[in-house]
Regions:
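Conserved acidic donor-binding segment of nucleotide-sugar-dependent glycosyltransferases
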Residues: 163-173, 181-186
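Membrane-proximal helix-turn-helix segments that form the acceptor-binding/catalytic region
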Residues: 1-17, 30-31
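Short alpha-helical segment that forms part of, or immediately flanks, the ligand-binding pocket
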Residues: 117, 139-145, 158
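Conserved catalytic-core segment of nucleotide-activated headgroup transferases in glycan assembly
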Residues: 44-113
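Carbohydrate-associated surface elements
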Residues: 23, 42
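Acidic donor-binding loop of glycosyltransferase active sites
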Residues: 118-134, 147
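A charged, aromatic-enriched C-terminal amphipathic alpha-helix characteristic of glycosyltransferases
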Residues: 184-218
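Conserved acidic donor-binding loop of glycosyltransferase catalytic domains
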Residues: 150-153, 159, 167
C-alpha cells in the first residue's frame, strides 16, 4: 500500500523528478509521466578550500573501500579487489554493518565530512563495487581528490568520472586486473588520477550542478 501511495503522490504532486543515475531515469520514466531529469550528485567545495590534495608519494600504499563490508554495499566484492593493493583494507563505519567485520577491515569511525575528506586524502587507492544504484558520493569524493576508484558501472559518478577503472557488475576478474595495473604501472595510475580530476571539473562542479538545475526549473 505504501508503494502505491508513493507512486500516486508522484503523479499528482510533482512537476518533475530529479535522479542521480541514468538507470534511475529510465525507472521513473516508466513509473510516471512526469518529466525526469538527471541531476548529478553534488560535492560542496567551500569546506575543503584549505585542504591540500596529497600527491602519490604523500599517500599511503593502501586502499579504502566505499561503504563497508556488508552485503548492501557489496563489501565482499570490494574487499577482494582491494586486497590486490594491500592486506590492510580500510572501510568507513556505516549504519549497516556486518558482525565481525572489524576482524577483516580497519574501520574508520564516524567523523565530520570535512574530516572524512582529509582522511580519504591519505589513501592511494579506492574500491567501491556497490551493485545498488545510489548517489555515488564515494566515487565523487575520490574524483575530487584524484584517487582512482575501481567500481561497477551502475553508478553514474563511477562510470563518468572513473571510466578507465569501471567494470560491469560482477566482473571481479577485470576489477582485480585493473587493481594490479594501478598498483604496478605508475604511468597508468597518474593518467587515471589526472583524468578523474579533469572530469570532475568538467561535469560535477557546483556551477555545473546549478546550471542544470535552473535550466530545468526555468522551463
Amino acid at each position: 500500500m505504501l508503494l502505491m501511495w508513493y507512486a500516486a503522490a508522484m503523479k499528482q504532486n510533482v512537476d518533475y523528478i530529479f535522479t542521480h543515475n541514468f538507470i534511475d531515469q529510465n525507472y521513473y520514466k516508466g513509473l510516471t509521466n512526469k518529466p525526469t531529469h538527471i541531476l548529478q550528485s553534488l560535492l560542496i567545495e567551500d569546506p575543503l578550500k584549505d585542504l591540500e590534495i596529497k600527491t602519490y608519494d604523500q599517500r599511503t600504499n593502501s586502499a579504502i573501500i566505499g561503504g563497508n563490508f556488508s552485503q548492501w554495499y557489496s563489501g565482499f566484492d570490494s574487499y577482494i579487489v582491494a586486497r590486490e593493493f594491500s592486506e590492510n583494507v580500510a572501510a568507513p563505519s556505516m549504519g549497516r554493518s556486518q558482525h565481525g567485520e572489524e576482524q577483516v577491515v580497519q574501520k574508520v569511525p564516524h567523523i565530520q565530512w570535512k574530516d572524512w575528506m582529509s582522511h580519504l586524502n591519505s589513501f592511494r587507492y579506492a574500491v567501491h563495487m556497490m551493485r545498488t544504484a545510489a548517489a555515488g558520493t564515494f566515487s565523487l569524493n575520490c574524483a575530487y581528490l584524484g584517487i582512482p576508484c575501481i567500481g561497477y558501472s551502475i553508478i553514474d559518478t563511477q562510470s563518468i568520472l572513473h571510466k578507465e577503472v569501471t567494470v560491469q557488475v560482477g566482473d571481479i576478474g577485470r576489477a582485480r586486473q585493473l587493481a594490479c595495473r594501478l598498483r604496478d604501472d605508475r604511468e597508468f595510475y597518474d593518467h587515471v588520477s589526472h583524468q578523474v580530476q579533469e572530469r570532475y571539473r568538467r561535469f560535477y562542479t557546483e556551477e555545473i550542478f546549478l546550471k542544470k538545475f535552473y535550466e530545468v526549473v526555468s522551463q
